[in-house]
A protein has these predicted regions:
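C-terminal PAP-associated
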Residues: 30-586
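Secretory targeting and sorting signals
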Residues: 2-29
Length: 586
């Protein structure tokens, strides 16, 4: 959520692919009909509604002013995660960076959303221990003390289920330069990594799976003054063994190689092992993605480089790093750079290397407006029916066009196929892939701008030659029935395109669209979840640049709730960024 990079693929997850053209409806190989997407459903209803507490989810009665305000303030949500209960496929859980807590708590906090209707309807909640949470669940969480000290922000959510009705929710909490309750000094960006566990309220009723908050465990704490920040989390639970595997990035700025750390639980999330470094020999490490093989093998892939002592060393080559464990995550082999590629990143469109561009003081030489999208992958999935591992990543073609490429391995990651385009498209950019696998099917989703009427390989998604933005971005889905070796045609998941370039952050002067979206699957039940701007209320641009990205409430037009992190009521809809979901029929 806080640093440069995308996020990671998940556990019972697999490949990210897309074949076909915009709006393709051709049948897949073998004559089967293509998959189809269901209705787009708004997950985060923060207008004329209310959030419920973890206590209420489990049958209690606690509520507070934070939850009430969350239902009316029309704030941002991004970086969604999604997981489907293997015991009851109608039970879906989702999470996101939820800024509904800003008016009362001053910063974003992990949202917790639950559906018992297969994603057709949702109940919105928050992870316990947000600032102002006086419930028994909140005060008992180890995050409460950190929040009391100033680490009031949380994000980078990822979720996974075991086979006993337990849901595991991983993320990090931090501050933006305030005391954290431990160091007693400023500019301690914490980066504490945690895993929360939700169990069934009634073990005999699987529809209550994951509805009762149980506890939160801290996996790693940042140490002030060492230039370290824990971020970019990933989590996978193994339904067969009950083990829970977690990995994350430990960023060191420009002073040394970032690290990938790993921890596991062998008691259904009650405790976790001390973190171990699994990225030795690789630099520039970020965004781990975990997959579990048919016999419990644990594989981890991430974006790395050959940068030597420094991630920014001259001549560093980017690529997909990989390592695996044959003893359920107890020990790992030596990490290697499995393949190299040129990542597709937002910085190529700014003209000065900036990862995102907006209105002054965030304007860029090219005059374009766009959020960062520089976490290139890889995203890893295991198709245990076909015995393959699949990786996918966003690559810059020689023209500058962003496309998703994938590779597969039939020998547990010892060797990989040559990279191939997942969803070849003549126009448009593709970014933020996510993978999952189930029932011998590898599913992939990603953002796609192939419907952009102003597309040029040298321009950011949804930007015209004159710097005007538009709603051109969609979510697309594709699947592979042979372990990632080939892919069927892609379909459009979203029923309306969105403008990812709305300037809702930095005092309503710069966009942020999160670092990932998610696809989840159990059996033949598949769901996608993404960040969506269809409810955002735009505004005329008083500065005269006419970028089409200004939003209602902009201070240039007299707005007084000027900052994304100002504790004021807005309600204009200018900040109304939401999470949407859709069921996929294979």
């Amino acid at each position: 959520m806080r640093t440069r990079s995308m996020m990671i693929g998940a556990a019972a997850s697999a490949a990210l692919l897309a074949g076909g053209v915009y709006g393709a409806t051709a049948a897949v190989a073998g004559g089967s009909p293509p998959p189809s997407a269901g209705a787009n459903v708004r997950v985060t209803v923060d207008q004329g509604s209310t959030y419920v507490s973890a206590d209420q989810l489990a049958g209690g009665g606690y509520t507070d002013g934070v939850l009430s305000r969350c239902g009316i303030d029309r704030r941002m949500q991004n970086e969604p995660t999604l997981a489907i209960d293997p015991r009851d496929h109608s039970v879906w859980s989702a999470g996101a960076n939820d800024y509904c807590t800003v008016p009362t708590a001053g910063d974003a906090w992990p949202g917790f959303y639950r559906s018992t209707t297969g994603g057709a309807s949702w109940t919105d909640s928050l992870l316990p221990a947000y600032k102002g949470d006086a419930s028994a669940q909140g005060t008992s969480s180890p995050l409460a003390a950190m929040v009391a000290g100033g680490a009031i922000a949380g994000g980078d959510p990822v979720m996974s289920w075991d086979g006993q009705g337990n849901l595991f929710y991983m993320g990090n909490n931090f501050n933006r330069g305030f005391t954290d309750g431990r160091s007693g000094v400023t500019k301690d960006n914490t980066g504490d990594v945690w895993v929360a566990t939700y169990g069934p309220s009634n073990p005999a009723d699987h529809s209550t799976d994951g509805s009762k908050y149980l506890h939160t465990v801290i996996l790693a704490r940042n140490t002030f003054g060492l230039g370290s920040f824990n971020d970019k989390t990933n989590l996978v639970a193994d339904p067969a063994t009950g083990n829970v595997y977690a990995a994350w990035s430990d960023f060191h700025g420009l002073t040394g190689c970032n690290e990938i750390l790993f921890s596991r639980s062998t008691d259904h999330g009650a405790t976790f092992s001390a973190p171990v470094k699994i990225s030795s020999g690789i630099c520039g490490n970020q965004g781990p993605s975990i997959a579990i093989g048919p016999s419990g093998q644990v594989s981890v892939a991430w974006e790395g480089s050959t940068g030597g002592a420094l991630a920014t060393a001259p001549g560093a080559v980017n690529g997909a790093a990989f390592v695996s464990s044959g003893d359920f995550g107890k020990t790992f082999g030596k990490a290697s750079l499995a393949l190299t590629y040129t990542p597709f990143t937002s910085g190529q469109f700014s003209g000065n290397g900036s990862r995102d561009c907006g209105d002054s003081p965030f304007n860029c030489p090219t005059g374009q407006t766009f959020p960062r999208f520089d976490l290139a992958g890889p995203y890893l999935a295991a198709d245990n029916v076909h015995g393959t591992l699949v990786m996918a990543f966003q690559v810059a073609q020689s023209s500058g066009q962003g496309q998703i490429e994938s590779v597969f391995s039939t020998d547990g990651g010892a060797s990989w196929s040559a990279p191939a385009l997942l969803a070849p498209a003549a126009t448009g950019h593709q970014f933020f892939p996510w993978l999952t696998a189930s029932n011998g099917r590898v599913s992939a989703v990603w953002y796609d701008s192939q419907g952009d009427p102003s597309y040029a390989a040298t321009r950011a998604p949804c930007n015209s030659a004159t710097g005007q933005t538009s709603a051109c971005l969609n979510v697309r889905y594709a699947e592979s029935a042979d372990g990632g070796k080939t892919w069927g045609p892609s379909i459009q998941v979203t029923d309306t395109p969105t403008n990812p370039n709305y300037e809702q952050f930095g005092g309503r002067r710069i966009p942020f669209f999160g670092d990932y979206l998610t696809v989840a699957a159990q059996g033949d039940t598949i769901g996608a979840v993404w960040t969506d701007q269809r409810n955002t209320v735009g505004a005329a641009d008083a500065s005269g640049d006419n970028d089409g990205a200004d939003v209602a409430g902009d201070p240039e037009t007299g707005g007084t709730c000027t900052s994304s992190f100002t504790t004021c009521f807005d309600g204009t809809g200018g900040l109304d960024q939401n999470i949407y979901t859709a069921a996929i029929t294979p």
